[in-house]
């Protein structure tokens, strides 16, 4: 029978005599040779056969040719022959010319053009396939045994072919001839469909069959292809598909069927669909995520397979303990945490009128311990509050929030407590001044206490003469004013003076002792006092001389150390062993007296040598890992403690190298430590050391409590003053100035790579993309040979186009960081694609100023984004500019507006036209402040005319307490007023 991989070409007649009972009429030559006869097969079925038995005559050359067989696309043909052969020894009285073999030939032709005499009956034009010999021959006619042989030939190129059989003197019968070819049947493998494919021209040929993903599947590796071998079998699969998100495998991985109701699949893959997590549902088939039910939400960081959760209920059992102008609040956790474990608390302080009808947020003088930073919240259920004023009425709201509170349209649940502070003594007098002095008196004044905590009744002044080993007898006087005249003093004498204020609560603390001196009797000061400037000047000059000498000694010493360091490194050894003048000249440029030079750890033949040279080895017994706080490229990031001998225990961040690492991964992991270990600056993350002599391998750095700058700003939207933000930017610029002076290019400067500690100090981190910058005055760039990804939104155009990374490209990135900081962590270029960003920057589009951004800061951003990198400011200039802005705070009050020109706004981000909204609620939804819709309605602000007249006090009164939200709503109200003025009718 015919196998599943073997069939005749479509539309052609099978070249077979098996089972044929009608006359075949094949061509014979000569006519006395092959003879067509009827016979029976093994099952005694009637068949037509060809036989020949001219064994008694020598020089036989009998040919038999089939009819024309269409080839179509087949390149190699297989022929199965069934035949019987008579044993020559069993035939009596025959000459030695008797044969027991015959020859198989084929002839290719584009048309059925063969005739009785054409082509010539000979090898060439006929092509010989093989000489066919039987496995068994028979000696008696009735016991003939059928032989089966299969031969193949190719490659074929014409439209068809003939088969021919040559007899040279055998006694045989040709029972069956079957021509066929082999193919690989269509199949599904790896969720891809591969079509039916014919085998190649040779038995060893491999034919490539391209595949396509089955419906609802996606490619996971390309190209998709299978190889069909010469036996018609598939082999060597390349590439694969997998079921798309929302679909699962079915029918033995031959189909991808949609997830049913109540199930979902968030990622592509071969896994099955999963039931919806609690509090969620699907609305259609093929769901990739289950939608949260009403009142339940997911945080942005929650995975799609996590349960939907709700906001927590209000804290319970608030207890207050008031002590004069400070208090302690304690409370119990909410009855319902909302199904989450990231519960936090916000304490809102409000100062109220006597009737508590009008409350406003407390000013910044009120201190909280632990300190509250915007929306980061408290984890402890206890807070100490100090520096509140005496007597006023206060209301404290303790809000319970969790990771999805920002998703809820309603304000957090809270418990409130009303507090009336007690009378407290005044604070200390900060400073005192000498107004005039005579031989027996002096007139003093002072600044009133910063916190009087009530009406000041009078001041008590204590003074005593300063003598050799101590002070004399103290005298006290009182004054109703913040000034006093002290009489009865000695001439040319020094006195120590202190002052304190008194209220009905009693005296406050004395001020710090301050020294004042009376004049001589003749009105002149003493000789010692007159010579004081000369003495001070001489001492200062002497001190400066000593400092200069010490600095010169240090410079010379460091110069020798740097030179020795360079010469002992692989870079230096290369210099000593090289006669290349260009190399020597470059190295000399690095060795600048008094300047520390960065050395690329990748120049070391042994990377471990760089680690030993620049990083301190720490014993594992000194390290204690407390919790995992994240995951990095090489392993986990943990928080822990470090206790070195002779030093106090400190919190540290610990990067660990995952198990099963390769030597290259270990080298790349430790290279960051080799880089960080060379830096020593308050705005660069500090390396404590490494652990390489035990497992796991660790890099230990200082711990930054507030983590990455971008997420920190988003959590504290609108909570900082402009001066605070500029201070952060100044710290980042100072760190980058330090790196650029060491000829070091960061290449990945972004807010996500700036870490913030508890004191809001920003430090540059993440040196994974950084590389050494060669100091070549002609072209001070590092040409990257890496093919890795680069952060398009933060990278300078020349670095994207030509992989030219310089300190100037870092300046471009710093401008983007400025924009991130002033926009409180907004994504640069918003939702534009990377290619759109590249095109826009190429067309001189630049980011517009963030909301409420000072003009001076946005201009500095634009300076950083100048196309010509040589015209961008240096980091030293940026630091100087920011210092001037900090000293002249008034310059930061001029707010930037979007202007046209070369550096025009990237996108039209104007506030929506309020006339397009039918209700105030629609307007609040448009500006993403829909959570306050109920507040506006309950307070009576139901029309745009009323909303346009609202002030910050109105927002506070109706419950909009977050400063960032107040600023956003007021900004939109201001635009609403402008639109109303533009649409007023004009009287003619």
Swiss-Prot record:
Catalytic activity: L-tyrosyl-[protein] + ATP = O-phospho-L-tyrosyl-[protein] + ADP + H(+)
The keyword Transmembrane appears for this protein: yes
Localisation: Cell membrane; Cell projection, Dendrite
GO biological process: axon guidance; axonal fasciculation; cell migration; dendritic spine development; dendritic spine morphogenesis; ephrin receptor signaling pathway; positive regulation of synapse assembly; protein autophosphorylation
Transmembrane region(s): 535-555
Listed CDD domains: EphR_LBD_B3, FN3, PTKc_EphR_B, SAM_EPH-B3, TNFRSF
Class of this enzyme: transferase
Domain of life: Eukaryota
Disulfide feature: 53-171
Protein EC: 2.7.10.1
Tissue: Present in 10-day embryonic brain and body tissues. Prominent expression in kidney. Lower expression in lung, and barely detectable in brain, liver, heart, skeletal muscle and thymus.
Membrane topology: Single-pass type I membrane protein
Membrane in keyword set: yes
Gene Ontology cellular component terms for the protein in this record: dendrite; plasma membrane
Role according to the record: Receptor tyrosine kinase which binds promiscuously transmembrane ephrin-B family ligands residing on adjacent cells, leading to contact-dependent bidirectional signaling into neighboring cells. The signaling pathway downstream of the receptor is referred to as forward signaling while the signaling pathway downstream of the ephrin ligand is referred to as reverse signaling. Generally has an overlapping and redundant function with EPHB2. Like EPHB2, functions in axon guidance during development.
UniProt protein name: Ephrin type-B receptor 3
Top-level taxonomy: Eukaryota, Metazoa, Chordata, Craniata, Vertebrata
Protein encoded by which gene: EPHB3
């Amino acid at each position: 029978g015919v196998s599943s991989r073997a069939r005749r070409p479509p539309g052609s007649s099978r070249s077979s005599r098996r089972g044929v009972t009608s006359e075949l009429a094949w061509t014979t030559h000569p006519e006395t040779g092959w003879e067509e006869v009827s016979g029976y097969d093994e099952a005694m079925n009637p068949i037509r056969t060809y036989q020949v038995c001219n064994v008694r005559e020598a020089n036989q050359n009998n040919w038999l040719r089939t009819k024309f067989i269409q080839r179509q696309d087949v390149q190699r043909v297989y022929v199965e022959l069934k035949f019987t052969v008579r044993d020559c020894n069993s035939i009596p009285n025959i000459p030695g010319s008797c044969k027991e073999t015959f020859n198989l030939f084929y002839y290719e032709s584009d048309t059925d053009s063969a005739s009785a005499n054409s082509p010539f009956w000979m090898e060439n034009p006929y092509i010989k396939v093989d000489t066919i010999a039987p496995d068994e021959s028979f000696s008696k006619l009735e016991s003939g045994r059928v032989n089966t042989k299969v031969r193949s030939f190719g490659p074929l190129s014409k439209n068809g072919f003939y088969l021919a059989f040559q007899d040279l003197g055998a006694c045989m019968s040709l029972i069956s001839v079957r021509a066929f070819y082999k193919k690989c049947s269509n199949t599904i493998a790896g969720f891809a469909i591969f079509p039916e494919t014919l085998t190649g021209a040779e038995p060893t040929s491999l034919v490539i069959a391209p595949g396509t993903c089955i419906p609802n599947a996606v490619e996971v590796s390309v190209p998709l292809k299978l190889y069909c071998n010469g036996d018609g079998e598939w082999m060597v699969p390349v590439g694969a598909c997998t079921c798309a998100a929302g679909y699962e495998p079915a029918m033995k991985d031959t189909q991808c069927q949609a997830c049913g109701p109540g199930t979902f699949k968030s990622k592509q893959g071969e896994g099955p669909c999963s039931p919806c997590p609690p509090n969620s549902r699907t609305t259609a088939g093929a769901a990739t995520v289950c939608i949260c039910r009403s009142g339940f939400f997911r945080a942005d960081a929650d995975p799609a397979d996590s349960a939907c959760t709700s906001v927590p209920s209000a804290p319970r059992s608030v207890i207050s303990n008031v002590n004069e102008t400070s208090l302690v609040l304690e409370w119990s956790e909410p009855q319902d945490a909302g199904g989450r474990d990231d519960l936090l608390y916000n304490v809102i302080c409000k100062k109220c009128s006597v009737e508590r009808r009008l409350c406003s947020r407390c000013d910044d003088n009120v201190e909280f311990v632990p300190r509250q930073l915007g929306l980061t919240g408290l984890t402890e259920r206890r807070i100490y509050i100090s520096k509140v004023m005496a007597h006023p009425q206060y209301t404290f709201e303790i809000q319970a929030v969790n990771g999805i509170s920002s998703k809820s349209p309603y304000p957090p649940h809270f418990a409130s407590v009303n507090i009336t502070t007690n009378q407290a003594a005044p604070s200390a007098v900060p400073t005192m001044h000498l107004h005039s002095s005579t031989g027996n008196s002096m007139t003093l004044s002072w600044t009133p206490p910063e916190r009087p905590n009530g009406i000041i009744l009078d001041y008590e002044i204590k003074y005593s003469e300063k003598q050799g080993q101590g002070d004399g007898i103290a005298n006290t006087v009182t004054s109703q004013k913040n000034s006093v005249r002290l009489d009865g003093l000695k001439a040319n004498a020094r006195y120590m003076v202190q002052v304190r204020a008194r209220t009905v609560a009693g005296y406050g603390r004395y001020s710090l002792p301050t020294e004042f001196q009376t004049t001589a009797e003749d009105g002149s000061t003493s000789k010692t006092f007159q010579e004081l400037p000369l003495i001070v000047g001489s001492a200062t000059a002497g001190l400066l001389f000593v400092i200069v000498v010490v600095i010169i000694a240090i410079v010379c010493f460091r110069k020798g150390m740097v030179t020795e360091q360079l010469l002992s490194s692989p870079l230096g050894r290369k210099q000593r062993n090289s006669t290349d003048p260009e190399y020597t000249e470059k190295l000399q440029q690095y060795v600048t007296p008094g300047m520390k030079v960065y050395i690329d750890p990748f120049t070391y033949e042994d990377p471990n040598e760089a680690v030993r040279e620049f990083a301190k080895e720490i014993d594992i017994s000194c390290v204690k890992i407390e919790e995992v706080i994240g995951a990095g490229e090489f392993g986990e990031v943990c928080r822990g403690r470090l206790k070195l001998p002779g030093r106090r225990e400190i919190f540290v961040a610990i990067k660990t190298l995952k198990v099963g690492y390769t030597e290259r991964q270990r080298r790349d992991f430790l290279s960051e430590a080799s880089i960080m270990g060379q830096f020593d600056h308050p705005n660069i993350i500090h390396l404590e050391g490494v652990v390489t002599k035990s497992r796991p391998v660790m890099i230990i750095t200082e711990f930054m409590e507030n983590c990455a700058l971008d997420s920190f700003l988003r959590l504290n939207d609108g909570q900082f003053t402009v001066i605070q933000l500029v201070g952060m930017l100044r710290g980042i610029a100072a760190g980058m100035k330090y790196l650029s002076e060491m000829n070091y290019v960061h290449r990945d400067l972004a807010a996500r790579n700036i870490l913030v500690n508890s004191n809001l100090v920003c430090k540059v981190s993440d040196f994974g993309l950084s590389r050494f910058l060669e100091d070549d005055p002609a072209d001070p760039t590092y040409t990257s040979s890496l093919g890795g990804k680069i952060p398009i939104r933060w990278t300078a155009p020349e670095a994207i186009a030509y992989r030219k990374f310089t300190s100037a490209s870092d300046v471009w990135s710093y401008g983007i960081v400025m924009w991130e900081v002033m926009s409180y962590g907004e994504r640069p270029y918003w939702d534009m694609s990377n290619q759109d960003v590249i095109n826009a920057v190429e067309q001189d589009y630049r980011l517009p100023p963030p909301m409420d951004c000072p003009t001076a800061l946005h201009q500095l951003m634009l300076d950083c984004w100048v196309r010509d990198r040589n015209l961008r400011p240096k980091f030293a200039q940026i630091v100087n500019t920011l210092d001037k802005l900090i000293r002249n705070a008034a310059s930061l009050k001029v707010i930037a507006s979007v202007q046209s020109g070369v550096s025009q706004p990237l996108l039209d981000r104007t506030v929506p036209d309020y006339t397009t909204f039918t209700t105030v609620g629609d307007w609040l939804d448009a500006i993403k402040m829909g959570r306050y819709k109920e507040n506006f309605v309950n307070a009576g602000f139901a029309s745009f005319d009323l909303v346009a007249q609202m002030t910050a006090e109105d927002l506070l009164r109706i419950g909009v307490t977050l400063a960032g939200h107040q600023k956003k709503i007021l900004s939109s109200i201001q635009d609403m007023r402008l639109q109303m003025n533009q649409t007023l009718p004009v009287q003619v």
